[in-house]
Amino acid sequence: MKNGFSFVTLLSGIVASALTLSPSAVASSQESNIQQATQVVLLNHGLQLNYPQPVRLEQVLLDAQQQNRQQNGSSNAQALSFHEGFQLFNLNKQAETDALLLHVRQQLIELAKDEDYRQASQLLLTLLEKHQYGYRENINLDIDAVRLKADLNPALPGHYALKQASRENKVLLLGLIDQKTVPFSTDLDVADYIADSTLSNNGNKSEAWVIAPNGNSSKVGYSYWNNQHMSVLPGSTIFIGFNSSNDELQALESDIVKLLGMIKG
């Protein structure tokens, strides 16, 4: 034991299960969380941090930094310091992400029956099949911010996986567009990144989704008449959705964007 945790080799095939609580079980669940141990898989190193009781986020981030230094020295610790791209997956809630992915797949398969959207549906299905997804907690993983504000430093009962990141000087173009990786530049905005690409017939010609490295997303205008001149962070994804105001298509598009923000990168 060291600093309240132990390292064990991560075994392959970790299976996460999600718990569904009835209203009558909420109180007992909250009580059990007080005693529930914390396990955090460090995906960069194939190791697991074990804590005998719920641990605060700050401690997990500190221990992850320590492991970075032990693995490859200070250079590795500095490389894995792009906190905007850190990912904390809640393994107890994996079933929720699996259900969302299944729902999106079913929606796209149904949409493919419409000849006008067949090609678009196949493009998006192929995109989704390329990745694995986890339930990503929407939480600030900047250790300096976590130290300064108590409400950014929650206890973490249960099972988690942490992926640390280095800065990637690239931007991904995905969706109903020529899907490719382009170099990041501080001089470019969303419209600039899209300018040299070809959209599919159903691709949105005036709006795009920007998915930041932290998983947050926003829909912005990029055409000449509604250009918001939005810049992006390195490692961001620009997603082109449907050129339609149909409510069902908009909901499907939003679900796809949510999944893309939860890729286990």
Segments predicted by a language model, with ranges:
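Gram-negative bacterial Sec-dependent N-terminal signal peptides
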Residues: 1-29
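Ser/Thr/Pro/Gly-biased, low-complexity, turn-/loop-rich segments
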Residues: 2, 25-265
